[in-house]
């Protein structure tokens, strides 16, 4: 009788790419719902528009490459990229921005390098940086949270603003911020106030702040944190990168806060402001563009956390996760080279 000899590992989990992507998308939903609750229908509209563009671009590229369109769309990677771009940009950004960013992410960043599993940079963050550098005003003008806004646009108002239709007096007031609909994010506000000589305590006395965090942003981050914990429980991601990101940001912000509390925000503010939890659990954990070994993943995550703090406090862009992730993507091959696991029976290196 002939026996089949199989190499290790002998116990495996049959998790397909589409299954992992589905789990990530489902775990994103709590954060998306809370974000829509505080910042209106615009976020949902941007996400839906991004999904349409992403799937269309994915199908077009697959047709040109003579690959299976059904298989490519079925892995859900394009949809996940679209959702991440949609929740990252301001809710009322013009429609052509989300179209441009999503097309760039799918066609250039993803497929120019060979498609899924071959891209050097995170597609969603590369698209975000393209839009931020090209259109800084539109990318830094966020809608005021519903709890402090004088006016919150309805779904019809949001559609009119995004697609630039219905240019009557009311819509012009919304666009110009006369009704108090738009304002800077807490990170932007704090950075501007500190540059004007205000202390963190004086800056956080403004209505956009709720104690030690930003209004709305604390709950948005908490929702993404909850989704991230479920993602870990489902074993769709590993803990190393997320822990490294949060630990790196916490340690760096703690040092700054202890040395100068008047000019540096608390670690709690940094952890629950901007895209911290979204990036820590759903963006930095991209297995294609991150380091591969367990120790390398921790270093990779910690590098992102430290870079975020440095860019937030010293750079020109307050929410620095996109730049930090892309810089860490560049460093991933070096981390893998110098932090290789030792093969049993051989020396390290």
Curated annotation (Swiss-Prot):
Q: How does it assemble?
A: The complex is composed of six subunits: RnfA, RnfB, RnfC, RnfD, RnfE and RnfG.
Might you give the EC number(s) for this enzyme? Answer: 7.-.-.-
| InterPro entries xref list | NqrB/RnfD, RnfD_bac
Q: In the record, which positions carry FMN phosphoryl threonine? A: 185
The domain of life for this entry's organism is: Bacteria
**Which Pfam families does UniProt cross-reference here?**
NQR2_RnfD_RnfE (PF03116)
Provide the transmembrane region boundaries: 36-56, 77-99, 124-144, 212-232, 239-259, 265-285, 291-311, 315-335
> Which cofactor is recorded for it?
FMN
Q: Which GO terms describe its biological process?
A: electron transport chain; transmembrane transport
Q: A single GO CC term, please? A: plasma membrane
Q: Which UniProt keywords apply?
A: Cell inner membrane, Cell membrane, Electron transport, Flavoprotein, FMN, Membrane, Phosphoprotein, Translocase, Transmembrane, Transmembrane helix, Transport
Name the PANTHER family on file.
Answer: ELECTRON TRANSPORT COMPLEX PROTEIN RNFD, ION-TRANSLOCATING OXIDOREDUCTASE COMPLEX SUBUNIT D
The membrane topology of this protein is: Multi-pass membrane protein
What is the protein's major site of localization? membrane
**Family of the protein in this entry:** Belongs to the NqrB/RnfD family.
Q: What does this protein do?
A: Part of a membrane-bound complex that couples electron transfer with translocation of ions across the membrane.
Q: Keyword Metal-binding on this protein?
A: no
> What protein does this entry describe?
Ion-translocating oxidoreductase complex subunit D
- Subcellular localization, as worded in the UniProt entry: Cell inner membrane
């Amino acid at each position: 009788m002939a026996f089949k000899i199989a190499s290790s590992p002998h116990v495996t989990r049959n998790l397909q790419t589409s299954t992992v992507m589905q789990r990530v998308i489902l775990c994103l939903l709590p954060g998306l719902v809370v974000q829509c609750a505080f910042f209106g229908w615009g976020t949902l509209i941007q996400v839906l528009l991004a999904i349409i563009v992403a799937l269309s671009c994915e199908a077009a590229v697959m047709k040109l490459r003579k690959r299976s369109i059904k298989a490519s769309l079925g892995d859900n990677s394009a949809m996940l990229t679209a959702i991440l771009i949609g929740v990252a940009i301001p809710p009322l950004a013009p429609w052509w921005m989300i179209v441009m960013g999503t097309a760039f992410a799918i066609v250039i960043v993803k497929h120019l390098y060979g498609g899924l599993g071959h891209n050097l940079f995170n597609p969603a963050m590369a698209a975000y940086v393209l839009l931020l550098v090209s259109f800084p005003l539109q990318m830094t003008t966020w809608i005021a949270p519903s709890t402090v806004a004088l006016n919150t646009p309805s779904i019809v108002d949001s559609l009119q603003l995004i697609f630039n239709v219905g240019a009557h007096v009311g819509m012009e007031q919304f666009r110009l911020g006369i009704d108090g609909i738009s304002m800077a994010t807490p990170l932007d506000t704090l950075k501007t106030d500190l540059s004007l000589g205000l202390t963190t305590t004086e800056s956080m006395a403004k209505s956009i702040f709720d104690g030690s965090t930003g209004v709305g942003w604390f709950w948005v981050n908490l929702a993404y944190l909850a989704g991230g914990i479920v993602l870990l429980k489902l074993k769709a991601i590993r803990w190393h990168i997320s822990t490294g990101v949060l630990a790196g940001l916490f340690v760096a912000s703690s040092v700054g806060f202890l040395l100068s509390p008047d000019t540096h925000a608390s670690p709690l503010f940094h952890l629950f402001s901007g895209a911290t939890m979204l990036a820590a659990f759903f963006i930095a954990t991209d297995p294609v563009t991150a380091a591969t070994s367990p120790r390398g993943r921790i270093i990779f995550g910690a590098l992102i956390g430290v870079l975020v703090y440095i860019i937030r406090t010293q750079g020109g862009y307050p929410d620095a996760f996109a730049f930090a992730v892309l810089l860490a993507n560049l460093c991933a091959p070096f981390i893998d080279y110098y932090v290789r696991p030792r093969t049993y029976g051989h020396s390290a290196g």
